[in-house]
């Protein structure tokens, strides 16, 4: 066997193997690599987009939280204002009611005072009439009259 012929055969076989690989094996491998490259690029773009969307979502979340805080503060301020108004209204109503009760009590006191005065006048006039009748029924005696007036003054006290 000739070494040159063997080398030439090997060269032809290598050329056929290279042609076969380039024609049938290499295109699917290149296609798979391109597909993987596209998928990796898409993944990287999606990751970048995800980071961007995450940053936007965090900013939006902070804005919503700030809006919620301001809304809560506004609601609390309104509730406080309303509570103060209710307290002021209740104070006003209570003062009006206290004034009415005071006026009613004053009127009742005046009415009771008038009643007691009238009753006292009636009692005094009855006692005076009794004293005068007692004085007129008996003879005029200074000592006796002094005793009667003393008893009369005792009955008044």
UniProtKB/Swiss-Prot annotation:
InterPro entries for this protein: ATP_synth_B-like_membr_sf, ATP_synth_b/b'su_bac/chlpt, ATP_synth_F0_bsu_bac, ATP_synthase_B_chain
Cellular location(s): Cell inner membrane
Alphabetical UniProt keywords: ATP synthesis, Cell inner membrane, Cell membrane, CF(0), Hydrogen ion transport, Ion transport, Membrane, Transmembrane, Transmembrane helix, Transport
GO molecular function: proton-transporting ATP synthase activity, rotational mechanism; proton-transporting ATPase activity, rotational mechanism
Annotated Gene Ontology cellular component terms: plasma membrane; proton-transporting ATP synthase complex
Membrane topology: Single-pass membrane protein
Protein origin, superkingdom: Bacteria
Membrane spanning stretches: 11-31
Keyword Membrane set for record: yes
Chief place where the protein resides: membrane
UniProt similarity note: Belongs to the ATPase B chain family.
Function (record text): F(1)F(0) ATP synthase produces ATP from ADP in the presence of a proton or sodium gradient. F-type ATPases consist of two structural domains, F(1) containing the extramembraneous catalytic core and F(0) containing the membrane proton channel, linked together by a central stalk and a peripheral stalk. During catalysis, ATP synthesis in the catalytic domain of F(1) is coupled via a rotary mechanism of the central stalk subunits to proton translocation. Component of the F(0) channel, it forms part of the peripheral stalk, linking F(1) to F(0).
Assembly mode: F-type ATPases have 2 components, F(1) - the catalytic core - and F(0) - the membrane proton channel. F(1) has five subunits: alpha(3), beta(3), gamma(1), delta(1), epsilon(1). F(0) has three main subunits: a(1), b(2) and c(10-14). The alpha and beta chains form an alternating ring which encloses part of the gamma chain. F(1) is attached to F(0) by a central stalk formed by the gamma and epsilon chains, while a peripheral stalk is formed by the delta and b chains.
Name recorded for this polypeptide: ATP synthase subunit b
Organism the protein comes from: Vesicomyosocius okutanii subsp. Calyptogena okutanii (strain HA)
